[in-house]
UniProtKB/Swiss-Prot annotation:
CDD domains: GTP_cyclohydro1
Subunit description: Toroid-shaped homodecamer, composed of two pentamers of five dimers.
GO MF entries: GTP binding; GTP cyclohydrolase I activity; zinc ion binding
GO cellular component terms, semicolon-separated: cytoplasm
UniProt GO BP: one-carbon metabolic process; tetrahydrobiopterin biosynthetic process; tetrahydrofolate biosynthetic process
Catalytic activity: GTP + H2O = 7,8-dihydroneopterin 3'-triphosphate + formate + H(+)
The name this protein goes by in its record: GTP cyclohydrolase 1
Annotated organism of origin: Alkalilimnicola ehrlichii (strain ATCC BAA-1101 / DSM 17681 / MLHE-1)
Family: Belongs to the GTP cyclohydrolase I family.
Length: 185
């Protein structure tokens, strides 16, 4: 597969009128193929692999929040990056997951061709599946280069998405507590 991706980048350079054998571009197809494999490595990962057994029994039933998880993904429409932060919360019901595993779940889904709306939902559903918690909340704010570098070229635009499951959806007080806590410095 790697050779095919590299050949495709070589062809793109040629179709742009470039010489892929010139000094500055000689290794570009291989580097671009390697970068694309890294940026989409989420396709090679699954939830069990990412968790690596880090699900623990716990009596805690209070909100757990992991804030400011940096993320980057590729827009599935233009293959251009979107870059932002995710805030993920859940209400445990007998189980908690390792702190780094929340960030790894975000990365697993972000490192695929995506739209932000689906990414937000996929993260929420995965955390719900793993924790079996009473609720999950995910809020993502991101800047999309497909909107900044092309099309309408709006440099300061940002997109926000949220998914609320369980108590976060059904209980406005719980939802508002989450939204307030993610804005607190």
């Amino acid at each position: 597969m790697s050779e095919r991706i590299e050949a495709a980048y070589r062809r793109i350079l040629q179709d742009l009128g470039e010489d892929p054998d010139r000094e500055g571009l000689k290794d570009t197809p291989a580097r671009a193929a390697k970068a694309m494999r890294f940026l989409t490595k989420g396709y090679q990962e699954d939830l069990d692999q990412v968790l690596n057994g880090a699900v623990f029994s716990s009596d805690n039933d209070e909100m757990v929040i992991v804030r400011n998880i940096e993320l980057y993904s590729l827009c599935e429409h233009h293959l251009l990056p979107f870059i932002g932060r995710a805030h993920v919360a859940y209400l445990p019901d007998g189980k908690v997951i390792g702190l780094s595993k929340v960030a790894r779940i975000v990365d697993m889904y972000a490192r695929r061709l995506q739209i932000q709306e689906n990414l937000t939902r996929q993260i929420a559903l995965a955390v719900q599946q793993v924790t079996g918690g009473k609720g999950v909340a995910v809020y993502i704010n991101a800047r999309h280069l497909c909107m900044m570098m092309r099309g309408v070229e709006k440099q300061n635009s940002e997109m926000s998405t949220s998914v609320m499951l369980g108590d976060f959806r059904e209980n406005p007080k719980t939802r508002n507590e989450f939204l307030q806590l993610i804005r607190t410095p």
